[in-house]
């Protein structure tokens, strides 16, 4: 069981992300599957995210993580984007990211939003 103080710190990091990026949710915990694609998955968040530095907004698919960053996350996120974009062509995902929520911060809540390139070839190479 995860201690409540670790859960609280991760939630506070999530709240800090929400304040910084002001996302507008299109979907949360949406199960993604399409008859033409041989895999499925559940996207944690899809919505409009505005970069606080550039003020540019993009439809972004985000997966929440509490562990380390791994290269395989790019495959997972690209696969989810592939399905989403097939299902919702009027609302194409143009960015994918992992939101890493840590419980180790001391003074103030922190998070890391790690963007990945969407790479459909990388996904196809996993199942071809």
Region annotations inferred by a language model:
Residues 1-40:
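Metal-dependent nuclease catalytic cores that hydrolyze phosphodiester bonds in DNA/RNA
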Residues 4-5, 30-127:
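Nucleic-acid nuclease catalytic cores
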């Amino acid at each position: 069981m995860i201690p409540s103080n670790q859960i609280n710190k991760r939630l506070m990091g999530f709240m800090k992300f929400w304040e910084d990026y002001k996302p507008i949710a299109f979907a949360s915990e949406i199960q993604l599957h399409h008859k033409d694609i041989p895999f499925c998955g559940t996207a944690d968040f899809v919505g409009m995210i505005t970069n606080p530095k550039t003020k540019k907004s993009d439809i972004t698919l985000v997966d929440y993580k509490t562990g380390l960053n791994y290269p395989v996350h790019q495959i997972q996120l690209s696969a989810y984007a592939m399905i989403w974009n097939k299902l919702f062509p009027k609302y194409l995902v143009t960015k994918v990211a992992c939101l890493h929520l840590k419980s180790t911060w001391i003074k103030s809540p922190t998070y890391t939003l790690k963007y990945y390139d969407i790479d459909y070839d990388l996904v196809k190479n996993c199942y071809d």
